[in-house]
Amino acid sequence: IPIEFAPQIPYHGVEDLRFTPGWGDSTSNEYWTYSFLWYLDGKPETSSEIIEKNLQLYYTGLIGRNIEKRKIPADRILTPKTSFKEVKASAGDVKTFGGTIYMLDYIEQKPITLNCVIHLKNCAASENKTFIFYEISPKPLTDGIWQQLDNLNTSFNCSKSD
């Protein structure tokens, strides 16, 4: 970080992505299901508004880098819309956010809504670092896939990240 396709996001650090095996298979229950971690320098302010803005920039850039490669017609391109709110903090979180990302599924070239849970974490062993863990899937939050995503979050040990 900065992220190549979204340099306007004003953070410095490392991004780590984890894709489910069926992430890119539209017939799979795991389609578009993945998680990523931002291991950031400093303690940037984090609010639902900041998350909305950053993810709007992130997915605009992600889609933009796929337009030419996937030959997406101009009439199918739509601006991503994000909506987030702070929810009850999950165990081990400083803050937890929930929301949605409405965007172009550039694989199938049609609109998709991704549900998202975001975990903001601090770590005593990493005094001037911030961890933001994103869980993402188009499946409803009641689907079993979310347990798999949350297992990544609950098994995360920030003291091993330094």
Predicted regions and their residues:
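Proline-anchored loop/turn motifs at beta-strand termini and strand-loop-strand connectors
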Residues: 1-15
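Hydrophobic side chains in beta-strands
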Residues: 7, 21, 38-40, 134-135
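Short, well-structured beta-strand
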Residues: 90-162
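Generic structural hydrophobic/aromatic packing signal, biased to beta-strands
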Residues: 1, 19, 58, 116-118, ...
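A structural "domain/chain start" motif
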Residues: 11-27
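Short glycine/proline-enriched turns and hinge-like loops at secondary-structure junctions
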Residues: 12, 30, 110-112
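Conserved polar/disulfide-associated segments of primarily extracytoplasmic proteins
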Residues: 22-106
